[in-house]
Amino acid sequence: MRTVVWQSLSEEQQDAILERPAIAEGANITAAVADVIAKVRTQGDAALLELTEKFDRVKPESIRVPSKEINAASERLSAEMKQALEQAYSNIAKFHKAQKPQPIKVETQPGVMCEQVTRPIQKVGLYIPGGSAPLPSTVLMLGVPAKIAGCRKVVLCSPPPIADEILYVAKLCGIDEVYNVGGGQAVAAMAYGTKSVSKVDKIFGPGNAYVTEAKRQVSNDFRGAAIDMPAGPSEVLVIADETADPDFIAADLLSQAEHGPDSQVVLVTPSPIVADQVTDAVQRQLKALSRADIAQKALASSLIIISESITQAVSISNYYGPEHLIVQTKNPRELLPLLDNAGSIFLGDWSPESAGDYASGTNHVLPTYGYTRTYSSLGLADFSKRMTVQELSAEGLQNLAPTVVTMAEAEGLDAHKRAVTIRVEKLTQNR
């Protein structure tokens, strides 16, 4: 990790120092994904089976996972694992149930009633990556709010063979259908539908560059599907003062660095002593990690920033807008009102990022790569949509008519004006 003194940098250097590592996109990925999507749209299930065998080197017996296979997953898991998953489920459900929106009903003037109502998105698709380690936590983070929101159909795609933990949590969440499909072909199948895979209205979940590009492409097609949010590499920023525990900070930085070589970790502190202690602790703890080589690559593009004060550290954090923000200071809650841009915030020594990643109850699907300035952490609202309602009485329309007519005339929209005056004339005739 590189250490820099913030005040010694010019404004241009400060901007440059906080730039994220570039995301490798490339025309080859764009073209390859477009080909996969086109193949799935034209060949349907046959394309899914062919691409699964090609990319995953597996030939599933069926695209949809049978119920008996999902039920059998429970028998192969330890009691300890099931208890952990159920505890996480309980906490995540509690927090997301509390997010249920309340209807709004306001009489803006006599006889003019305005309302806001919320309805669930009818059909949603969840993408769960494969790889060397299963991600049942992501199933929880997507499946729990989808069901609480009331989505009528919730389906899940994951590359085969699907881990027992994922199948168990899918059943725990009440997910309707699980498919043995991964990669960009899974995104295409959910966006456009095949004989076996249900078409959905919105797709959620992380993935590699091909999955991310597939989500982008289908979301740009009105016949495709909406997506949750733009994706980018994982990141964490820690604000720490002289009271912070350097071993805790190092552990938090490394827990993010081990996600991938493109992850970025940043420490901002006014204490050079803490900075040095954290540097030593990172090197010491790194040796014990099974993914040390991955974490080491991430650390190469990571930073320790020496700020003038905690106030300046907050400003740096707000400018950077991290996915995860950890505050290890004497009075961390006092800083909360000053923090504007972050996906999820972890206050105090006893709030490691890992808690939020798995089981505290908050959602771990978060905006990254600076999108925290405009995007929120995933929640119940992402699985719903709002509608407004207005109901005017005869008296209400008469009272509002002069305002609407004047504005319609100013905009040159005669039919808008007439839709009001024709009603007012009718009311006048009926008196």
Swiss-Prot record:
Under SUPFAM superfamilies, the record lists: ALDH-like
Q: Where does NAD(+) bind?
A: 127, 185, 208
User: Organism's domain of life?
Assistant: Bacteria
The record's keywords, sorted A to Z, are:
Amino-acid biosynthesis, Histidine biosynthesis, Metal-binding, NAD, Oxidoreductase, Zinc
* Gene3D superfamilies noted in UniProt: 1.20.5.1300, Nitrogenase molybdenum iron protein domain
Q: Which residues bind Zn(2+)?
A: 256, 259, 357, 416
Q: Name one GO molecular function term.
A: histidinol dehydrogenase activity
Q: Report the active site residues.
A: 323 (proton acceptor), 324 (proton acceptor)
State the EC number(s).
1.1.1.23
Cofactor (UniProt): Zn(2+)
What is this enzyme's catalytic activity, as reactions? L-histidinol + 2 NAD(+) + H2O = L-histidine + 2 NADH + 3 H(+)
Tell me the route in metabolism or biology where this protein functions. Answer: Amino-acid biosynthesis; L-histidine biosynthesis; L-histidine from 5-phospho-alpha-D-ribose 1-diphosphate: step 9/9
Read off the PANTHER family from this record.
HISTIDINE BIOSYNTHESIS TRIFUNCTIONAL PROTEIN (PTHR21256:SF2), HISTIDINOL DEHYDROGENASE HDH (PTHR21256)
Function according to Swiss-Prot or TrEMBL: Catalyzes the sequential NAD-dependent oxidations of L-histidinol to L-histidinaldehyde and then to L-histidine.
Q: Which NCBIfam families match?
A: hisD
Q: What is this protein called?
A: Histidinol dehydrogenase
Q: What is the lineage of its organism?
A: Bacteria, Pseudomonadati, Pseudomonadota, Gammaproteobacteria, Vibrionales
